[in-house]
């Protein structure tokens, strides 16, 4: 989804596999890679137990894609008749009047396949403002028209107080207000944070000669 902005106040989600770290008075919750995979399967189980059987599974690039892969794998081994799985991309930009707008890319494949009787599961890592999901739903409706499928939204993390659109995901696991740092994320972190909160080996790997992390280590 769209990159998170540091919240005004934060608290870790109950039961979430976090390694919290407060930096500049903002709590960063570092999410363990294996815990995220397990949560992806838990999310899939929640969807399956609810009786929902999607025909299409759509991951939102970037964070929703690894979760979407796990969810799709789970549903397939449960013999759900999934027709297609794919990824779409969203991008935030400043529109007229300086409001933040969301553009959606890559919907052509799904829209060319779906019928009104189909079920589409849209998966992202975190639902915060909700603007990303709202833009996706509106874009599908605008392109598919009479063939608009039933669409449901699933995510691992939900930030209810950040919601700006009045819609909520159909499925989620954890509610949180923390600034989430996913296992693949490095940008915006210090070398110390990467070494202590992610993995010391990652901190060593990213110190490429001449790069900013190598210079930081030498300082």
PLM regions and their residue ranges:
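PRPP-associated nucleotide enzymes
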Residues: 1-219
């Amino acid at each position: 989804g769209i990159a998170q902005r540091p919240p005004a106040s934060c608290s870790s989600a109950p039961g979430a596999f976090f390694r919290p770290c407060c930096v500049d008075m903002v709590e960063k919750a570092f999410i363990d890679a294996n815990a995220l995979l397990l949560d992806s399967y838990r999310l899939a189980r929640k969807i399956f137990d609810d009786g929902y059987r999607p025909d299409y599974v759509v991951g939102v690039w970037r964070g929703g894609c690894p979760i979407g892969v796990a969810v799709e794998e789970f549903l397939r081994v449960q013999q759900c008749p999934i027709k297609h799985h794919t990824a779409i991309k969203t991008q935030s930009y400043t529109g007229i009047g300086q409001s933040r707008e969301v553009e959606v890319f890559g919907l052509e494949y799904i829209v060319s396949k779906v019928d009104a009787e189909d079920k589409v599961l849209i998966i992202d890592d975190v639902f915060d403002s909700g603007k990303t999901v709202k833009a996706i739903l509106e874009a599908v409706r605008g392109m598919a028209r009479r063939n608009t499928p039933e669409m449901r939204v699933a995510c691992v993390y939900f930030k209810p107080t950040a919601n700006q659109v009045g819609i909520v995901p159909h499925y989620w696991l954890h509610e949180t207000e923390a600034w989430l740092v996913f296992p693949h994320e490095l940008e915006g972190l210090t070398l110390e944070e990467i070494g202590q909160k992610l993995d010391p080996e990652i901190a060593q790997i990213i110190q490429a000669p001449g790069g900013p992390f190598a210079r930081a280590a030498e300082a």
